């Protein structure tokens, strides 16, 4: 029961930090633009939803490994990730180029 509360709190924490990035930072949504930012070494953090297709997930992880970028696996499906971003559509993956006022890169790197 304690572990469930901890994951709920960490999920809420990530959601709040993600909303702050959406307001004050720079980001890209979608598979093609995430790969483009990884190839150009512009991404600082990549977030992947829980139900991202395995081939896409492995390709993003490969490019992130080459670019030495942290990959965070979101504990929800693509609908939840889209809602956390404040969008009304599904988001499979997103890359954060500039976190703005948020410290999401530090907190996801520790986990």
UniProtKB/Swiss-Prot annotation:
One Pfam family cited in the UniProt record for this chain: Ribosomal_L7Ae
The organism's place on the tree of life at top rank: Eukaryota
Disulfide bonds: none
Molecular-function annotations in GO: RNA binding; structural constituent of ribosome
InterPro entries: Ribosomal_eL30, Ribosomal_eL30-like, Ribosomal_eL30-like_sf, Ribosomal_eL30_CS, Ribosomal_eL8/eL30/eS12/Gad45
Keywords: Ribonucleoprotein, Ribosomal protein
UniProt KW Ribonucleoprotein keyword: yes
Gene Ontology cellular component terms for the protein in this record: cytosolic large ribosomal subunit
Keyword Ubl conjugation: no
Cited PANTHER family: RIBOSOMAL PROTEIN L30 (PTHR11449)
Family: Belongs to the eukaryotic ribosomal protein eL30 family.
Protein's name in the database: Large ribosomal subunit protein eL30
Annotated source species: Oryza sativa subsp. japonica
